[in-house]
Amino acid sequence: MLAAEPRSLLRRLNATCTRALEAAAAACVGARHYEVTAEHLLVALLDDRESDVAVVFGHYRADVEGARGQAKRALSSLRDGNPGKPVFSPLLLEWVQDAWVYASAELGEASVRSGALLVRAALAAGRYFPSELPALEALPSDELRRRLGELARTSAEAAAAAPAGAP
């Protein structure tokens, strides 16, 4: 259930996630889908080689191409033909909200980075993604939750991360 106003929630995304969300929305429009989904955003995050997501996948030697392909297959099954502007999927917004709670409460950060989204997705992929994503589900979610800061310290997002309460 969404507790925050979507617009306020999306403003909590860091620059990397905001760019990925913009790319996800553009892909959605290009495919004439009705909703920007978690799969759209996941594909965009997997495409950014300097994000937390890329660094974490690299650390675990996880199958980036497999995850991208699985998400794209899920997208190919979405209803298309939308002549207008798509909306954000409620599941996408819940994913961002849950990542915001994790980022602020557990990481003490002022914005949502892609690693926080990845942690929430790894912990509860079935909640945000209607299709199975074995490459995502194979990540050691509990370890990732505990060690995200350490694992993603070399990402471009880590350098830009600001603690909660920072200007």
Could you tell me what each predicted segment is?
Residues 1-167:
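Histone-fold recognition with a strong bias for associated Lys/Arg-rich disordered tails
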